[in-house]
Amino acid sequence: MELLSIDFLGQSLRLEGSMAGWQQVFWSNTLVAQQAASADDQDNYLHEFQLTQGETVLTCRLEVKVTWQPFLIEYRATVDGKLIAEGSRNTKDIEQQIPHTPTKAERKFSLIGLVSLGMKALKSAKLIKVALASASIAAYSWLFSIEFALSLIACLIFHEYGHIRAMKYFGMKTKGIYLIPFLGGLALSDEKINTRWQDVVISIMGPFFGLILSLILMVVYWITGEMFFAGLAVFNAFLNLFNLLPILPLDGGHVLKSISFSMNSKLGITLCALAAIGGVILSYQLGLALFGFLLIMGSLEIVFEWRARHHSHLLPLDKYGQLVSSAWYVGLVSSLIAIIWYFASSGDALLQLPMQILGT
């Protein structure tokens, strides 16, 4: 990840590194110093390199102290012993930075490249949004009535709007919402995230908005007695619960991956494993066999990738962030299951369908 970027002798001096311990220093996008990963915990780093100005050789030093949780980096840059820059950066600074994008080498013309270019153009075109939205309406109309299909599409848009709001909160530019038949929707941004906290908030805000909408629909159902709103509330809750499954690229996969990949202590990993096991057991006890099975699959996927977590460019969650993210996720899942459970006990065959699917 990019830890630091400052002006140094008229060019950009960039420091990249990871929790694994490796660090690289780039001046004007040229590698000038690096340190390999170390088995020992290390907070202080010293990078020394030489630059030339005309016939003059300049001896440069970059002293860095890194604290990962809570994140804080303190730096001091000198040239021939003269102080050039010093300061510090915290999590907020990392969140607001624009990640460095390496310059790609020019490629010769190829059919694959032409197809890729066409797909990118199609992806950014407004026409594809209309086409996907129309296909989604047709798909849901085939399963339900046109009125229910349009209402369900509105629920999906509200879910994706939650992601959009989170992206804008972090100052990210968004490209809009794409509806995908039978799979839901997709909110896209032109920019990349820098921290695990951004990943958690952006991922979880979609289902969180979905929960709010289901609660509103429940209240409308209690007031009017119209089964239409009951059906919309339970199916909206089901779609958002499905999105919280701990499987990438679903929202739940991003949330749980960010939480588990931010843990370094044996106690934290043990608690994370026990929570996953407890979730599986509870799912089967509640008759949510499908949810329990997918929880096992998602947990195994995270376990297999966990050892490579230090090489990620994302700044990990601190302990407070891990606790808040875990409580937010569990509370959200529990609330959505409670809504599905409530309507399943009504005796209506259609309202029982989401619960039956989860129990298969």
Where are these regions (language model features)?
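Amphipathic alpha-helical segments
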Residues: 25-32
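Hydrophobic transmembrane alpha-helices and their immediate loop junctions
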Residues: 2-12, 17-22, 35-56, 63-360
